[in-house]
Structure formats: C-alpha cells, structure tokens
C-alpha cells in the first residue's frame, strides 16, 4: 500500500518544497522532450518544418489547457476531501472525474479533427507550411483522449501529495519519446508526423504508469456503485472546473489571435518565434510546479480549516518564486543565443534571420519573467480556496492585452508589439489575481 502526504500537519515549508521538487523535475523533463521534438524537427527536417510545428502551438494548447483546467479543478475536490478525511466522497469524485474525462476527450477529439485545417487557414498560416501544420495538429488532436487521461491521473496523484510518480512516468516517457523521435523522423523518414506520433505514444506510457500507481493507494477504493453517475456531483465538478478551463481557453484564444499576426510575418519569422516559445516552456515549468504545490497545500489546509498554515505557506512560496525567477533570468540572458541554436540551423537558408528574431523575443520575455511566476502562485492559491472566478477574469485580461498588442499596437511599433504582448498580458493577469487574493486574505483568512 502507498500512503498519501497529509499537508495539514508538519512544517509548511518542508511540505511545499519537497512536493514541488519532483514536480519541477517532472515539468522540466516534459519540456525537455518537447524541446527534443522541436530540435529534431528543426535541425533534422528544417526551419520550415519547425515553423509548421510552431504555427499549431496555440491551437493545440487550447485543447491541452482546456483539459488541464478541468482536471485540475476536479483534483482540487480530491485534495479537499482528503484533507477532510472524507474518503468515500473522495472516491466518488475520482469515479465521476474519470467519466467526465472520457466524455471530454471524445468531444474535443471529434471537434478538433474537423476544425484543424480550417482553423489553420483562418489563422493565416503561410501556404508553404500549411500541409505540414495540418498533419502535425491532427495527429496531436487524435491523441487527446490519452492526454486527458494522463492529466487526470497526474492531477489525482498530486492531490494526494505524490509528486514523485508523475516524475518517474515523465522520465520513462521522455526517454521513449526521444527514442521514437529518432526512429520515426530519421529512420522511417516520417517527418513531423513521426514527431507528433512519438509524443502521443509517450503520453500513453505516462498515463499507464500513473494509473497503476493510483490503484495501489490505500485510500482509493472505488466500488462498482460509485460508477453510477451522480448528476449533482457531476454538476459541481463541471461548475468548479469550467472557470479554470475557460480561463485557459481565453488565454489560448488570445494566443491564437496573436499567432495569426505572427503568421503574417512569414515562415522564417514563425520559426524564430517558435524556437523562443519552446525555451519559454522550459522557463515556465518551475512556476507551474510551485503553483500546483501551493494548490495542493492550500486545498488540504483550507479543507481542514487551518488558515494560519495558509499564511505561512504563502510567505514561503513568494520568497522561493522570486529567487527562482531571478536565477533563471540571469542564466538565460547569458545563454539565450546558444539555447535558440538548439532548434535553428544557421547554415540553412533563413536560419540566421530566424535566430535574430528569436533572440530579440526571448530577451524581452526573460526580463519580465518574475511577473509570470507570480501569476501561477496567485491563480492556484485562489483556486484552492474555491475562488476560481478571478482566475477566469485574469484570463480575460490576458486576452484583451494580447489582442490589443497584436491588432492595434503592431501598427504603431511594428513586429516588436508581438514580442511585448507577453509581458503586457502577464501584467494585466497578475493584477487580476493578486489584488483579489490580498482582499480575500484580509477579509477571510485573518
């Protein structure tokens, strides 16, 4: 039997840090194999192939973040009932969450496959990469049910305070993904289809590993009758998960509108922009992990009514996140050109221009990294305290800022508006979650 981690007792700093470290490594590993995907495509197939992959990013992220938002919302109920020691309710939540994930995965896959090419055309995807972009996006969408299952399994494990199993799953999947990338892209000559297929198969392995671990947790015992739909609970789960999902959808929609303006700059510009976004994913993974650790800690202690521990946990986390952002910023500013050359072959036609685009974008983004890190903390804390409305509002703020920069400011300052749009969007989002947190803290937690 495997025990879960009870965060309602013991040292808050120790709980948050020890739980966050495996998550950081997990996210880091996930980003590394996504980087390996992009690097193999960019340097093995070509700059335009990298642009084709990059032009699909926001479209696929909309699906991925919808799934992530819903499953994160569902798992918050698991954390809360675990903190309250209501194990029967907790198991019912797990069962209903699983059924919802199947339904969500099927719906998103069906809609996504039909909408893929029309959406890419609507987003001004350059004609010289449109076919490859369609192949890559449709292959990734075909694996949506697998990704949904993996996200739910990982979220459940984290709700129990188990951050190590997702890490082990990621190590296995990352190794498999890179190996399959090499086989499918170089040996079979499948191009970007091979890279997408490798990612889907790796996610399947991750899910199976996490699922087997969940079955061994002593608190998880789902009886046959628990699979009977409880429509009241289903409604509660959906109503709680939807604001988080909508927040992510809104952010992704803003990114899609931004991508349409990026695509108009041509495939070489898209390649440089894509290379920076791959590095950006690596930079963000630490903040994402700390946010999830905070969410689990806050959800358990909020459910147990231990508000003094919430204040302690927040102070500790803010110190960690600022120090981490400054450290990452310093390292990347020095090495940014070398990082981008992992994806871009400067000896290829268009390579140097793509590299210059990426360096400029990454420089602007990294200077404001601490804002991004703080967003993840405040969003997750509000969610853990059953106050996900402001997370949704922050998503609207990101949407408005991105659209303004991509569609209005671009006429004033040129393509730099596409780079500056990220820090501007982060600032708007941070204000929408930080101010409500301090109001809620003064009114309720104190």
Show where each model-derived region lies:
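N-terminal transmembrane alpha-helices
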Residues: 7-44, 58-73, 77, 102-109, ...
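Short runs within selected transmembrane alpha-helices of multi-pass transporters and secretion channels
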Residues: 71, 140-158, 166-174, 195-208, ...
């Amino acid at each position: 039997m495997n025990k879960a981690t009870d965060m309602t007792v013991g040292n808050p700093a120790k709980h948050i840090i020890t739980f966050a470290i495996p998550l950081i490594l997990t996210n880091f590993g996930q980003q590394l194999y996504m980087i390996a995907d992009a690097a193999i495509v960019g340097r093995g197939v070509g700059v335009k192939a990298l642009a084709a992959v990059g032009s699909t990013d926001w479209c696929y992220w909309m699906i991925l973040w919808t799934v992530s938002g819903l499953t994160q919302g569902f798992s918050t109920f698991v954390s809360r009932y675990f903190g309250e020691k209501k194990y029967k309710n907790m198991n019912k939540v797990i069962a209903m969450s699983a059924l919802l994930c199947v339904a969500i995965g099927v719906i998103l896959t069906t809609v996504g496959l039909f909408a893929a090419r029309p959406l890419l055309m609507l987003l001004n995807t350059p004609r010289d990469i449109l076919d490859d972009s369609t192949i890559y996006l449709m292959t990734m969408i075909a694996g949506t049910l697998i990704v949904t299952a993996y996200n739910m399994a990982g979220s459940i494990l984290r709700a129990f305070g188990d951050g190590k199993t997702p890490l082990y799953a990621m190590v296995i999947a990352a190794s498999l993904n890179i190996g399959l990338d090499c086989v499918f892209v170089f040996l079979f000559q499948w191009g970007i289809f091979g890279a997408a297929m490798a990612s889907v198969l790796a996610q399947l392995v991750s899910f199976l590993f996490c699922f087997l671990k969940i079955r061994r947790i002593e608190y998880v015992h789902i009886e046959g009758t628990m699979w009977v739909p409880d429509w009241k609970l289903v409604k509660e789960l959906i109503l709680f998960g939807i604001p988080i999902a909508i927040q992510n959808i809104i952010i992704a929609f803003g990114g899609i509108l931004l991508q349409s303006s990026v695509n108009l700059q041509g495939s070489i510009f898209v390649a440089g922009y894509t290379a920076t976004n791959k590095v950006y994913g690596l930079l963000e993974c630490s903040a994402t992990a700390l946010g999830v650790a905070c969410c689990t800690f806050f959800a358990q202690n909020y459910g147990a009514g231990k508000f003094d521990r919430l204040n302690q946990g927040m102070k500790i986390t803010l110190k960690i996140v600022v120090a981490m952002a400054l450290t990452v910023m310093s390292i990347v500013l020095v090495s940014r050109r070398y990082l981008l050359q992992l994806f871009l072959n400067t000896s290829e036609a268009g390579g140097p221009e793509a590299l210059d685009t990426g360096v400029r974008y990454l420089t602007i983004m990294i200077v404001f990294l601490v804002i991004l890190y703080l967003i993840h903390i405040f969003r997750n804390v509000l969610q853990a305290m059953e106050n996900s409305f402001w997370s949704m509002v922050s998503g609207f703020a990101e949407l408005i800022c991105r659209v303004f920069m991509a569609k209005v400011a671009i006429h004033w300052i040129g393509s730099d508006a596409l780079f500056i749009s990220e820090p501007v969007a982060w600032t708007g989002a941070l204000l929408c979650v930080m101010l409500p947190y301090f109001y809620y803290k003064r009114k309720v937690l104190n």
